[in-house]
């Protein structure tokens, strides 16, 4: 039966030394989503490896994590979660945050983009910004082997926001993070191989 709304997934394991992105690049224009990650060692992958071999972002394709649910903190730096019912933690609480924030209205600017308006003070801790006119969802991920304390480096001019009226909060996300509020200049603790979802907004 013809199903016009059906999605085509491309699934693969690591491909050993070949890597699935190298092996299947020719198929990318014809699929909707990548489901790479069987046997991926997410906690050992460097940021560039995440970006090129897993995320699909350089090729304009979305992705989902697989092996053991991936790393749900670092995955958010690439706007990806595990597939529902694969892994210990449900991605639904993060999806709910996406929905309440209105992520479909945001422009994604990752650490790999020279115009990303949010950076961190530590090169091992990456930030991706999902930018709306009145608020920004920030995903921060610590790729290092140790806990880090970082502060955010924010390009207020490119955001068109008044720093004196800005608020920085970590919303509660079930099984992901507790609610917190940070001052704009304070150091934010990020555990090794984990991260935070933050919302930068203007006080009303």
Regions found by a protein language model. Name each.
Residues 165-186:
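Solvent-exposed beta-strand/loop surfaces of large extracellular or lumenal domains
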